[in-house]
């Protein structure tokens, strides 16, 4: 039975795990690392890089390196958060054909789902390499506070990557699964998850295989990226004060500052001070300029103080919704790389009144939980019941633009809820159902998920027709809505296609594109392997020709030299078949040389035997002397 993998598709890093017996195992990638940077790069040579190779070349290719695309997934181009992001990243964020935020590289547009699919493909290949078999099914994690559009876009990314997404699972819930799988006693825990781009807080009751989410809250635009950018701004401002040069307009310099910020942030988790040293960061008429400064932990903490405090309000809201006080939480589990920051741990300790639990790896625990959920769905993990919730209220717009909730936030999913509405005008023969998600009282202040029309309502005075609207949220947190005219029995049902979102045709096209890219990548890899083999063959043949060239005729020697020259001339060719053909030709004409080498080694064999015999005689003498000594 094929394995189901668990993927933590992170803003900064991604991780893949699989069930190995009764335990979840994190799989190392081809570079030997347990997490993979969520970075995709397009080089000038038309090559596509994913993960560490992409991150490594970011400084020299800032506009072609796409990172933190998870912050754009499922968002409209005119979203205020997208506006904010545009000012912070060196790559181009553009308006997609559907009005969503997309990215553009070398004139080609990509949806965030497509970029995410490239990262998921890398995770899929990592798992396939380890398991030695094809992987087709996965459980993928998302921030608990992701809305329907963001969840749907993540599911689309899985489809584009060639994966059947069995379940979309919330990151804190996945972490709780990994933490509590072996816990028998009942506990109330809080999962505080501060990652690269998002923040979640979930309150759960766990015990004896039951994981029940009581409430969840968060901020989908708060994470390590914001801490990094705060440092980038500080470095640039300090440099401007000192040198009078603004680095914020220099994309190459900004990318170097970002790398330095990430490194400084990590170092300050374990030391009180770090040094930033960036030689040749820029230049003016007077010559090259270098950026050198010291940064203390205290200064860093003061720069990001408001970001740290932003995590407290969602914690308060989650506790309130769960009907609990901070003191009633038995354990606080820290998830996400940012929770290694001492200030974060201090705030958590202060708010909950207890030291956080540090027994799980914050970078890996989410992927492990996803793998466990995969095991549950496959039937390999028994006696586990997971009860998750919808993070935001769902409803429709009613008369006067009011948001009428049908499903309240923190309702256990899957769930279904119906309510009867009527017409606002006499003889109204159609109604438009506009579906929103959020917590504001007016519909337009919330996130519009989509809309549809119910037509053919028989003429009647206002308030007489009965229209039943049904919301259905599946276990992935994805919404289906139907509206039915109870008088005629006419029904209209939709899976909420986000007001932007990808159509089935878009997804199909992107799947084909991804498959073509996979074929291209395979072709490119075969080309590299063929060139490596060709260079090795040239090297060994030239060496043999130097040593044994006098053992073949002049004509044969010339044929070999010509074949070597021909093969060298096609080493830079993109035609792999041509390289293979020239290799075959060189191998054929070199056969006589191989024969000469073999004959030469055969001729040397008798001498070797004589040497061996004389060695044996010495050994015998040596042993005999020892016997006499005894």
UniProtKB/Swiss-Prot annotation:
Q: Has UniProt tagged this entry with the keyword GTP-binding? A: no
Locate the compositionally biased regions of type Basic and acidic residues. 515-529, 540-553
Q: Name one Pfam family in it.
A: HSP70
Q: Where is this region: Disordered?
A: 515-553, 600-630
Key word Transport present in the record? no
Question: What UniProt keywords apply to this chain's record, in alphabetical order?
Answer: ATP-binding, Chaperone, Nucleotide-binding, Phosphoprotein, Stress response
Query: Which InterPro entries does the protein's record reference?
Result: ATPase_NBD (IPR043129), Chaperone_DnaK (IPR012725), Heat_shock_70_CS (IPR018181), HSP70_C_sf (IPR029048), HSP70_peptide-bd_sf (IPR029047), Hsp_70_fam (IPR013126)
SUPFAM superfamilies assigned: Actin-like ATPase domain, Heat shock protein 70kD (HSP70), C-terminal subdomain, Heat shock protein 70kD (HSP70), peptide-binding domain
Upregulation details from the record are:
By stress conditions e.g. heat shock.
Question: What Gene Ontology molecular function terms does this protein carry?
Answer: ATP binding; ATP-dependent protein folding chaperone; unfolded protein binding
Which residues are annotated as modified residue Phosphothreonine in the UniProt record? 198
Q: Which domain of life is it from?
A: Bacteria
Q: Which family does it belong to?
A: Belongs to the heat shock protein 70 family.
Q: What does this protein do?
A: Acts as a chaperone.
The protein's name is Chaperone protein DnaK
Q: Which organism is it from?
A: Bartonella henselae (strain ATCC 49882 / DSM 28221 / CCUG 30454 / Houston 1) (Rochalimaea henselae)
């Amino acid at each position: 039975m094929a394995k189901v993998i668990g993927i933590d598709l992170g803003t900064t890093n991604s991780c893949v795990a699989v069930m190995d017996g009764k335990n979840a195992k994190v799989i190392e990638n081809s570079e030997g690392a347990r997490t993979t940077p969520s970075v995709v790069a397009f080089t000038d040579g038309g090559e596509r890089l994913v993960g560490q190779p992409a991150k490594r070349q970011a400084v020299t290719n800032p506009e072609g390196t796409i990172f933190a695309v998870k912050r754009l997934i499922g968002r409209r181009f005119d979203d205020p958060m997208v506006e904010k992001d545009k000012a912070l990243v060196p790559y181009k964020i553009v308006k997609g054909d559907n009005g969503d935020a997309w990215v553009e590289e070398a004139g080609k547009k990509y949806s965030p789902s497509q970029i995410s699919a490239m990262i998921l493909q890398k995770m899929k290949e990592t798992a396939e390499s380890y398991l030695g078999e094809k992987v087709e099914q996965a459980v993928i994690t998302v921030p608990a506070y992701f809305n329907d559009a963001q969840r749907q876009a993540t599911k689309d990314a899985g489809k584009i990557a060639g994966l059947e997404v069995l379940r979309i699972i919330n990151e804190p819930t996945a972490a709780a699964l990994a933490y509590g799988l072996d816990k028998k006693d009942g506990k109330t825990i809080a999962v505080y998850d501060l990652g690269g781009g998002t923040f979640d807080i979930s309150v759960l009751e766990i015990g004896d295989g039951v994981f029940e989410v009581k409430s969840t809250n968060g901020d989908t635009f708060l994470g390590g990226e914001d801490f990094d950018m705060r440092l980038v701004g500080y470095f640039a401002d300090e440099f401007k004060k000192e040198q009078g040069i603004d680095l914020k307009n220099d994309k190459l310099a900004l990318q170097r500052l970002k790398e330095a910020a990430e490194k400084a942030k990590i170092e300050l988790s374990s030391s009180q001070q770090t040094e930033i040293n960036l030689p040749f960061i820029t230049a003016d008429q007077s010559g090259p300029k270098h950026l050198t400064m010291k940064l203390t932990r205290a200064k860093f903490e003061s720069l990001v103080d408001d970001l740290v405090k932003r995590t407290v309000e969602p914690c308060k809201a989650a506790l309130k919704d769960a009907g609990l006080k901070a003191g009633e939480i038995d354990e606080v589990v820290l998830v996400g790389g940012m929770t290694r920051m001492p200030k974060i741990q201090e705030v958590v300790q202060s708010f909950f009144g207890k030291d956080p639990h540090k027994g799980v790896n914050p970078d890996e625990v989410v992927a492990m939980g996803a793998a466990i959920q995969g095991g549950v769905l496959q039937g390999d993990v028994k006696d586990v019941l997971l009860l998750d919730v919808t993070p935001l209220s769902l409803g429709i717009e009613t008369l006067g633009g009011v948001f009428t909730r049908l499903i309240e936030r923190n309702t256990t999913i899957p769930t279904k809820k119906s309510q009867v509405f009527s017409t606002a005008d006499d003889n109204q023969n159609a109604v438009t159902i506009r579906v929103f998600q959020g917590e504001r009282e007016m519909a337009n202040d919330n996130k519009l998920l989509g809309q549809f029309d119910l037509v053919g309502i028989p003429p009647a005075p206002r308030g007489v027709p009965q229209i039943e609207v049904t919301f259905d949220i599946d276990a992935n947190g994805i919404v289906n809505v139907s509206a039915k005219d109870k008088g005629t029995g006419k029904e209209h049902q939709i899976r909420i296609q986000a007001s932007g979102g990808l159509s089935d045709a878009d997804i199909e096209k992107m799947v084909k594109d991804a498959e073509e890219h996979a074929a291209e990548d395979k072709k490119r890899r075969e080309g590299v392997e063929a060139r490596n083999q060709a260079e090795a063959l040239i090297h060994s043949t030239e060496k043999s020709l130097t040593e044994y060239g006098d053992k073949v005729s002049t004509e044969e020697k010339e044929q070999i030299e010509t074949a070597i020259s021909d093969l060298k001339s096609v080493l830079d060719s993109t035609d792999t078949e041509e390289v293979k053909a020239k290799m075959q030709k060189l191998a054929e004409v070199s056969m006589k040389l191989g024969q000469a080498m073999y004959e030469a080694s055969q001729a040397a064999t008798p001498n070797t035997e004589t040497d061996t015999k004389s060695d044996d005689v010495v050994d015998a003498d040596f042993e005999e002397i020892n016997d006499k000594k005894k």
